[in-house]
Amino acid sequence: MNILVIKSSVFGDNGNSSALVNAQVDALKAKHPQATVRVRDLSTDPIPHLDGNRVSAFFTSATQRTDEQQAIDAFSLALIDEIKAADHIVLGLPMYNFGIPSQLKSWIDHVARAGITFRYTEKGPQGLLENKPVTVLAARGGIYAGTSNDTVTPYIKLFFGFIGITDVEFVFAEGLNMGDDVKEKALAVARSELLAST
């Protein structure tokens, strides 16, 4: 089993979502001792944000790309290959100011590639990647799940579904900034849920 871990907390392993990710990976490894784990920490190893050069590289034909554009394309394809190689994806997902971390958006922008991970057809967009389980460990300071203020959950579902991955499960730890008692209970419930789903 190949596990791809995506951590997006700006606090690295000190983030609440990262702690939940580590617990999930430990549970998966206990169930699958031979599993290999690929960790991509977007805080310690950030992905460049899109700019004109990077977008141009994606849309320039392979035979016409400069050396710089070839490197940009190769970097993007390497991220996509990590997804293709994974049997299970574990994503740590904080909410910052009602959105996803900017470093996670950069990862998405390098993975969502027309003609590579999705394509447009007469019937609409079609994902090109093989479906696989994704566990999203969502940590929030307040309580937002199921409300109109939660723009993050539908966005992540939309992104993965757009590239062909629809088996996406969320585990929420909310109210983490609403006092120590609330935080401890929320994290305990989240750990219990992720263990039950492993």
UniProtKB/Swiss-Prot annotation:
Gene Ontology terms for molecular function: electron transfer activity; FMN binding; oxidoreductase activity, acting on NAD(P)H as acceptor; oxidoreductase activity, acting on NAD(P)H, quinone or similar compound as acceptor
Keywords carried by this UniProt record: Flavoprotein, FMN, NAD, Oxidoreductase
Cofactor: FMN
Manner of cofactor binding, per the entry note: Binds 1 FMN per subunit.
Cleavable signal peptide: none
Catalytic activity: 2 a quinone + NADH + H(+) = 2 a 1,4-benzosemiquinone + NAD(+); N,N-dimethyl-1,4-phenylenediamine + anthranilate + 2 NAD(+) = 2-(4-dimethylaminophenyl)diazenylbenzoate + 2 NADH + 2 H(+)
Residues noted as binding FMN in the record, renumbered to the chain: 9, 95-98
Functional note: Quinone reductase that provides resistance to thiol-specific stress caused by electrophilic quinones.
Alphabetical list of HAMAP family matching this protein: Azoreductase_type1
UniProt protein name: FMN-dependent NADH:quinone oxidoreductase
Originating species: Alcanivorax borkumensis (strain ATCC 700651 / DSM 11573 / NCIMB 13689 / SK2)
